[in-house]
Amino acid sequence: MKPKVVAIVPAGGSGRRMQSSNPKQYFLINGMPVLVHTLLRLQQFPLIDEILLVVPHSDMVFVRDNIEKPYQLTKIRGIVAGGRERQDSVRNGLKCVVEKDEIVVIHDGVRPFVTEKILSRVIDAAHRSGAAIAAVPAMDTVKEVHSDGHISVTLDRKRIWLAQTPQAFHRRIIQEAYKKAVQDDYYGTDDASLVERLGIPVEVVPGSCTNIKITTPDDLILAEAFLKKEEGRI
């Protein structure tokens, strides 16, 4: 039987690395905000039952009136006020997760090219083992560097994977991981790192090099190219 799946979508980023005052989730790709591209994909995937969208408190009315309603995003269960950091925003989203939700998927609002295949892999793995993420193997040589700018060690590239979202977890596991992080005042760089601190194994499934996170102007150029390819225009 298919598990009940809720997706938490944090979308509280700034436009700092875009050198813009406009938050990156509202930048346009082919005339439509990045966030809308992401949400429409999740809306269309049968694996996702409902969506909890987490945005800055000041954006809540704007998002409801300009994104949720116009694009008929009927899977959105609620628009939740975000926090100071991404982790705080996801924690606020988790407060709205209910007992019927078996699997919690966490996916960045600025990763608009997630595929149903990736999502299926992550959900299946999480349902089976409790925790899973999408990731891609490192293609470049990876160096660990001292604070003085000199190389400390060359890492074994065969063992290095670059984490992406979606990341999926049994509800109780991710709730416990976030509870522990709050108790310890710990901030990780992704959701899986909080689960790892509980000593729970996290399964890695193949992501995609096109499943990019939009953070820089160059990413927007790539995104336009990916979209044109999907639409058969190149």
From Swiss-Prot:
The record marks R157, K213 as: Positions MEP for the nucleophilic attack. Keywords: Isoprene biosynthesis, Nucleotidyltransferase, Transferase. It holds the Pfam family IspD. Pathway: Isoprenoid biosynthesis; isopentenyl diphosphate biosynthesis via DXP pathway; isopentenyl diphosphate from 1-deoxy-D-xylulose 5-phosphate: step 2/6. One of its GO terms (molecular function) is 2-C-methyl-D-erythritol 4-phosphate cytidylyltransferase activity. NCBIfam families: ispD. The lineage of its organism: Bacteria, Pseudomonadati, Thermodesulfobacteriota, Syntrophia, Syntrophales. The record marks R17, K24 as: Transition state stabilizer. It comes from Syntrophus aciditrophicus (strain SB). This is 2-C-methyl-D-erythritol 4-phosphate cytidylyltransferase. CDD domains: CDP-ME_synthetase. It comes from the Bacteria. Its EC number is 2.7.7.60. Gene3D superfamilies: Spore Coat Polysaccharide Biosynthesis Protein SpsA, Chain A. It catalyses: 2-C-methyl-D-erythritol 4-phosphate + CTP + H(+) = 4-CDP-2-C-methyl-D-erythritol + diphosphate. PANTHER family: 2-C-METHYL-D-ERYTHRITOL 4-PHOSPHATE CYTIDYLYLTRANSFERASE, CHLOROPLASTIC. One of its GO terms (biological process) is isopentenyl diphosphate biosynthetic process, methylerythritol 4-phosphate pathway. Belongs to the IspD/TarI cytidylyltransferase family. IspD subfamily. The gene is ispD. Catalyzes the formation of 4-diphosphocytidyl-2-C-methyl-D-erythritol from CTP and 2-C-methyl-D-erythritol 4-phosphate (MEP).
